[in-house]
C-alpha cells in the first residue's frame, strides 16, 4: 500500500504552450470511467492530453507509483499512454477503501449450501449430521495407548531398558479427526531416542536446552599445550597471557656466564638456558607475565631467534626479562607465530607486519580508506600506518578482506 504525505489539495496546474494541460484537485471535474475504483479523495483532471501525455508527467507530483495509479484506474493500459482529454483519473484511494475494493474484485468462491442439520467437517472433507455420534472404534487391548505421532497404538510401558524415557512418544499435535480408524500396532517402534515431554495431551514441544559452549580447537599446538588454553569466541580482541599454572618454573636454572653459548642481548636482565626438549612456548610459560610476542622481541633476529622461533637450540641462552621497548624490532605477523595468533584470538587473515600487540581489528570492506577506518576508530592515519606497515606509505595497499589493526 502506498504511504506518503498527501500534498496540500489545492489546484495545481501545469500549462505549456501548445502542450498538455492538467491539474490536481479534490474533485473530479470531468467524466470518470466506470472502471475507476470508488472512494477516491484526490483526482488528476486532464484538460488537454495532446502531445502524447502519459501518467509519468504527474506521478512525481502526486508521489504515486505507476502500477498503483493504473490499479486505481483500470481503463489505462500497461504503459499509461492512453490518457484522454476532458477526463478525470483517481490519484489517491484511502487504504481502507482500497482493501474493500480489492476484496470486491476477488469474491470468495461460491459453495453449495448444506442441507439443514448438517455441518461441514473440514478434516474429512465431507458433511456430517451435527448430532451424529462419533464413529465407533475398536477398543485397544489392556496396556496399550494410542500414539498420535506414529498413528498407531503401542505398549504404555514400552520404554528402553537403558534409555529411560528414550522410547516414550507424546503427541506431536492434536489428534486427527479420523485417528480412531487407524490400525493398532503392538510392539516396540525402535530404540530412537526422544526428548519430547512424557506429559500426554499437551501438544506442546519440550523446550530444548542450548548445548554447552565448547572452545574452538587450536590445531598443531606444541607438546604439553593440548586442551590447556581456552579461547572464548566473544573475546577476539583480548590477549591471553600464559598463567604458568601447569608448568613449573625451573628455579635451578644456571645463571648465565660469560662463557655460555649464545649472544648477549643489550638490556637483558635475566637469561634462560635452553634444554633439549624446550620450545619457545614452554619457555615463555615458565615466566609468568611473559608474552610470547615479548619473548620474540627480547631475542630479535638474526642474533638469537628467527621470526618463527624455528632455530631454538639446546645449550643456548635466550633472554626472558628485559626492556622490550629497547629491543623492539620490526616484527612481521609471522613472528608472533601461528600458535601465538590462535592463542591471542587474532582474526584471519592479517597482513605481514601487523603490530603483534594489537588488541582490536577492523575488516577492510569495499569502499574503505585509511582515513575512513581511522576516523571510525578515533585514531590518526599515522597510527593506522604504524600498526599496519603493509598498507604502504600512502595506504595504496589497503586490501579488501584483510583485518587491519586499529588498537594496541
From Swiss-Prot:
The signal peptide here is: 1-17
Annotated LysM domain ranges read 42-91, 270-320, 360-406
Q: Which GO terms describe its cellular component?
A: extracellular region
Which stretches does the entry tag as region Disordered? 98-178
Major localisation = secreted
Asked whether the UniProt record includes Secreted among its keywords, one would answer: yes
Where does the record place Pro residues bias? 106-116
User: What superkingdom heads the lineage?
Assistant: Eukaryota
| Location of this chain's protein in the cell | Secreted
User: Which CDD domains does the UniProt record give?
Assistant: LysM
Keywords from the named record: Chitin-binding, Repeat, Secreted, Signal, Virulence
Gene Ontology molecular functions: chitin binding
Q: Does the keyword Metal-binding apply?
A: no
InterPro entries the record matches: LysM1-like, LysM_dom, LysM_dom_sf
What role does this protein play?
A: Might have a role in sequestration of chitin oligosaccharides (breakdown products of fungal cell walls that are released during invasion and act as triggers of host immunity) to dampen host defense.
Q: Which PANTHER family does the entry link to?
A: AM15, PEPTIDOGLYCAN-BINDING LYSIN DOMAIN
Q: Domain comment text? A: The LysM domains bind chitin and potentially related carbohydrates, and might be involved in damping host defense.
- The entry's protein name is LysM domain-containing protein ARB_01488
- What is the protein's species of origin? Arthroderma benhamiae (strain ATCC MYA-4681 / CBS 112371)
Amino acid at each position: 500500500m502506498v504511504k506518503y504525505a498527501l500534498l496540500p489539495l489545492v489546484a495545481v496546474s501545469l500549462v505549456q504552450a501548445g502542450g498538455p494541460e492538467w491539474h490536481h484537485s479534490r474533485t473530479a471535474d470531468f467524466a470518470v470511467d466506470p472502471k475507476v475504483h470508488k472512494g477516491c479523495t484526490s483526482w488528476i483532471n486532464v484538460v488537454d492530453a495532446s502531445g502524447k501525455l502519459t501518467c509519468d508527467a504527474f506521478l512525481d507530483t502526486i508521489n504515486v507509483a505507476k502500477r498503483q495509479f493504473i490499479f486505481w484506474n483500470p481503463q489505462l493500459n500497461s504503459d499509461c499512454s492512453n490518457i484522454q482529454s476532458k477526463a478525470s483519473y483517481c490519484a489517491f484511494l484511502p487504504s481502507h477503501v482500497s482493501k474493500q475494493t480489492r476484496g470486491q474484485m476477488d469474491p470468495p468462491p461460491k459453495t453449495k449450501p448444506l442441507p439443514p442439520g448438517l455441518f461441514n467437517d473440514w478434516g474429512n472433507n465431507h458433511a456430517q449430521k451435527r448430532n451424529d455420534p462419533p464413529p465407533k472404534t475398536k477398543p485397544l487391548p489392556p496396556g496399550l495407548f494410542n500414539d498420535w505421532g506414529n498413528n498407531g497404538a503401542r505398549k504404555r510401558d514400552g520404554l528402553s531398558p537403558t534409555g529411560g524415557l528414550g522410547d516414550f512418544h507424546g503427541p506431536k499435535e492434536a489428534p486427527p479427526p479420523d485417528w480412531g480408524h487407524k490400525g493398532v500396532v503392538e510392539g516396540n517402534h525402535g530404540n530412537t531416542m526422544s526428548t519430547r515431554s512424557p506429559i500426554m495431551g499437551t501438544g506442546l514441544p519440550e523446550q530444548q536446552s542450548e548445548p554447552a559452549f565448547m572452545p574452538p580447537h587450536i590445531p598443531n599446538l606444541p607438546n604439553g599445550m593440548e586442551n590447556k588454553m581456552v579461547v572464548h569466541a566473544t573475546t577476539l580482541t583480548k590477549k591471553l597471557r600464559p598463567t604458568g599454572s601447569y608448568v613449573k618454573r625451573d628455579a635451578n636454572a644456571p645463571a648465565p656466564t660469560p662463557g655460555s653459548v649464545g649472544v648477549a642481548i643489550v638490556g637483558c636482565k635475566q637469561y634462560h638456558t635452553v634444554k633439549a626438549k624446550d620450545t619457545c612456548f614452554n619457555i615463555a610459560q615458565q615466566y609468568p607475565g611473559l608474552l610470547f610476542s615479548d619473548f620474540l622481541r627480547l631475542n630479535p633476529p638474526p642474533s638469537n631467534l628467527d621470526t618463527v622461533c624455528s632455530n631454538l637450540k639446546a645449550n643456548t641462552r635466550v633472554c626472558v626479562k628485559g626492556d622490550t621497548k629497547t629491543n623492539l624490532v620490526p616484527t612481521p605477523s609471522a613472528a608472533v607465530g601461528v600458535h601465538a595468533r590462535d592463542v591471542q584470538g587474532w582474526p584471519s587473515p592479517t597482513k605481514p607486519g601487523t603490530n603483534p600487540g594489537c588488541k582490536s581489528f577492523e575488516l577492510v570492506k569495499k569502499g574503505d580508506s585509511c582515513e575512513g577506518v581511522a576516523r571510525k576508530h578515533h585514531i590518526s592515519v599515522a597510527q593506522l600506518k604504524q600498526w599496519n606497515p603493509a598498507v604502504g606509505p600512502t595506504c595504496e595497499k589497503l586490501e579488501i578482506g584483510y583485518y587491519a589493526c586499529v588498537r594496541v
